[in-house]
């Protein structure tokens, strides 16, 4: 039977048990010593694909570690799982759906059947619709109610309808097309809409309402606020269609809102929100960078898809990163993973990967609903470049937790200023080096002696300057951020998450935990506004409701 119908006890597999024994043998493994003993270690534990270079030599592994981790991937049936996903089998078991975000980046001429229907013509039909719309807006042919061309596009969406598109449009800002500015409105916080709308003119603004169901609370509330603002600024109901379009599978609701049917871009239930930037949800990306660059983004992701399907596991970038995550999370006690981009334009990648990883693998039951046998997804956190060095890197270096990290850095800057980029790149490398090397007590004492301190002061200060080292990290290098390379990078992390879900036996493509808060939120709201008099289910929530009602004005 297919792997997803027979969730396994991964801890009972021979490779898992061998890894437990190997972990004990690696207790005193020193990366410092490993590099000193093997001049080829960097070559052995690095690889290139799809415009990305991965150095994973600064990890608590040797060749036996990698071999055993690869055996684990083989024993959980990873190759069959990969084939199942790409061929359209139902691997989202709890919702009875295939998982086919990869279909969105497949080239013209490919065939892929879902329920006996080839979906690829429809995929490329929507891509052509995107191309046509973007062309009309960029050429000034799509005009607002005053017949002026559109200058600003506001994407109204949250979660996957926001994080992925925001990441890509910001990361590819050097590729931005002139004449159209893209903005994002996600949170149901009036201050966000206030600050955004203060810099817009209704007559030249186009809103994209991105919601698969067209009933996402935050998105609908913001869409209604945008509509009210548009009318207050001089727009009319009759001309509303010029200023609002939608990406949704609920055409009726979008039409009822006032959006013309021809301006509604479809979504499919086999594309999850956090995997949807490749679909019409990526419309703001195409508007920001142009459809030619958007298609390059898709092509880059497709090359990673090919690598993922065909490369042997020991040379497969997403598989190796996934296995390293399992190694640290399940055998070394790591509970979080840091994403550290050394590039201003990539500053939002951590937010996207938080949703991608934590919403996918934050699960506590196997695909059949029984409890998991081991820990699953880690906390994903981090931030941009040198800023982190002056904030939380201290904990990475001298804290008590083992926190693996991914450093992401380009070789070439779009905006060279003197020798800034050389220093940025040097800082990235030196941070990973410092995590690995650390500083011994002897080195700390010698350093203090060189500064002229007496022995009594050295004895007091040296312990504080000792840095354990042996902290693992990966370094991902790109020559220069481009649509194609960014597509490959994001797709790589998508596949990494999937691989880990297969190993743990969980479903990476549902998110039932998100739904509970939505359901409870309705009752809390009704109690806040006084339309429901019954007390909340617990005293804490009711107390906080009472506190709000006693002090809120308006």
Curated annotation (Swiss-Prot):
<dbReference type="GO" id="GO:0051156">
    <property type="term" value="P:glucose 6-phosphate metabolic process"/>
</dbReference>
<dbReference type="InterPro" id="IPR023096">
    <property type="entry name" value="G6P_Isomerase_C"/>
</dbReference>
<dbReference type="InterPro" id="IPR035476">
    <property type="entry name" value="SIS_PGI_1"/>
</dbReference>
<keyword id="KW-0413">Isomerase</keyword>
<keyword id="KW-0312">Gluconeogenesis</keyword>
<dbReference type="InterPro" id="IPR046348">
    <property type="entry name" value="SIS_dom_sf"/>
</dbReference>
<dbReference type="InterPro" id="IPR018189">
    <property type="entry name" value="Phosphoglucose_isomerase_CS"/>
</dbReference>
<dbReference type="InterPro" id="IPR001672">
    <property type="entry name" value="G6P_Isomerase"/>
</dbReference>
<feature type="active site">
    <location>
        <position position="390"/>
    </location>
</feature>
<dbReference type="GO" id="GO:0006094">
    <property type="term" value="P:gluconeogenesis"/>
</dbReference>
<dbReference type="InterPro" id="IPR035482">
    <property type="entry name" value="SIS_PGI_2"/>
</dbReference>
<dbReference type="GO" id="GO:0005829">
    <property type="term" value="C:cytosol"/>
</dbReference>
<protein>
    <recommendedName>
        <fullName>Glucose-6-phosphate isomerase</fullName>
        <ecNumber>5.3.1.9</ecNumber>
    </recommendedName>
</protein>
<comment type="pathway">
    <text>Carbohydrate biosynthesis; gluconeogenesis.</text>
</comment>
<dbReference type="GO" id="GO:0006096">
    <property type="term" value="P:glycolytic process"/>
</dbReference>
<feature type="active site">
    <location>
        <position position="518"/>
    </location>
</feature>
<dbReference type="Pfam" id="PF00342">
    <property type="entry name" value="PGI"/>
</dbReference>
<comment type="pathway">
    <text>Carbohydrate degradation; glycolysis; D-glyceraldehyde 3-phosphate and glycerone phosphate from D-glucose: step 2/4.</text>
</comment>
<dbReference type="GO" id="GO:0097367">
    <property type="term" value="F:carbohydrate derivative binding"/>
</dbReference>
<feature type="active site" description="Proton donor">
    <location>
        <position position="359"/>
    </location>
</feature>
<dbReference type="GO" id="GO:0004347">
    <property type="term" value="F:glucose-6-phosphate isomerase activity"/>
</dbReference>
<comment type="function">
    <text>Catalyzes the reversible isomerization of glucose-6-phosphate to fructose-6-phosphate.</text>
</comment>
<comment type="similarity">
    <text>Belongs to the GPI family.</text>
</comment>
<keyword id="KW-0963">Cytoplasm</keyword>
<keyword id="KW-0324">Glycolysis</keyword>
<dbReference type="GO" id="GO:0048029">
    <property type="term" value="F:monosaccharide binding"/>
</dbReference>
């Amino acid at each position: 039977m297919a792997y997803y119908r027979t969730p396994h006890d991964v801890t009972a597999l021979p490779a898992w048990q061998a890894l437990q024994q190997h972990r004990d043998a690696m207790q005193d493994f020193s990366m410092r010593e490993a590099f000193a003993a093997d001049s080829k270690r960097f070559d052995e534990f690095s690889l290139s694909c799809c415009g990305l270079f991965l150095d994973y030599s600064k990890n608590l592994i040797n060749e036996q570690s990698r071999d055993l981790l690869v055996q684990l991937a083989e024993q959980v049936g990873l190759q069959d799982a990969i084939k199942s996903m790409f061929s359209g089998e139902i691997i989202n078991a709890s919702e009875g759906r295939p998982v086919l975000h990869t279909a969105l980046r497949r080239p013209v001429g490919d065939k892929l059947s879902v329920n006996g229907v080839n979906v690829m013509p429809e995929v490329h039909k929507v891509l052509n619709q995107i191309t046509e719309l973007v062309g009309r807006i960029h050429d000034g042919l799509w005009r607002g109610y005053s017949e002026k061309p559109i200058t600003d596009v506001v994407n109204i969406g949250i979660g996957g309808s926001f994080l992925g598109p925001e990441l890509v449009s910001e990361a590819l800002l050097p590729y931005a097309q002139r004449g159209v500015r893209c903005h994002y409105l996600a949170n149901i916080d009036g201050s966000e809409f206030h600050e955004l709308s203060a810099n817009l003119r209704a007559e030249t603004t186009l809103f994209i309402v991105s919601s698969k169901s067209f009933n996402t609370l935050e998105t609908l509330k913001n869409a209604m606020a945008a509509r009210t603002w548009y009318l207050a600024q001089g727009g009319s109901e009759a001309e509303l269609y010029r200023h609002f379009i939608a990406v949704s599978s609920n055409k009726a609701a979008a039409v009822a809102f006032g959006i013309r049917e021809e301006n509604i871009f479809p979504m499919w239930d086999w594309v999850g929100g956090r995997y949807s930037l490749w679909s019409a949800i990526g419309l703001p990306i195409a508007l920001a960078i142009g459809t030619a660059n958007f298609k390059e983004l898709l092509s880059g992701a497709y090359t990673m898809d090919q690598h993922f399907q065909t490369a042997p596991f020991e040379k497969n970038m997403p598989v190796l990163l996934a296995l390293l995550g399992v190694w640290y999370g399940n055998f070394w006690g790591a509970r979080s993973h840091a994403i550290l981009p050394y590039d201003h334009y990539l500053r939002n990648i951590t937010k996207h990967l938080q949703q991608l990883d934590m919403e996918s693998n934050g699960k506590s039951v196997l695909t059949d609903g029984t409890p998991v046998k081991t820990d699953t997804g880690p906390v994903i956190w981090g931030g941009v470049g040198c800023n982190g060095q002056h904030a939380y890197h201290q904990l990475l270096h001298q804290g008590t937790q083992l926190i693996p990290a991914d450093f992401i850095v380009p070789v070439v800057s779009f905006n060279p200023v003197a020798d800034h980029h050389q220093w940025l790149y040097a800082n990235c490398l030196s941070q990973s080096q410092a995590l690995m090397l650390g500083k011994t007590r002897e080195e700390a004492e010698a350093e203090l002696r060189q500064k002229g301190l007496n022995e009594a002061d050295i004895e007091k200060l040296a312990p504080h300057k000792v840095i354990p080292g042996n902290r693992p990290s990966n370094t991902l290098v790109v020559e220069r951020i481009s649509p194609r390379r960014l597509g490959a990078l994001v797709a790589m992390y998508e596949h990494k998450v999937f691989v880990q879900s297969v190993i743990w036996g969980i479903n990476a493509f549902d998110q039932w935990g998100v739904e509970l808060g939505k359901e409870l939120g309705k009752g809390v709201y009704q109690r806040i506004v006084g339309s429901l008099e019954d007390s909340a289910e617990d005293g804490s929530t009711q107390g906080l409701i009472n506190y709000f009602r006693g002090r809120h004005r308006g």
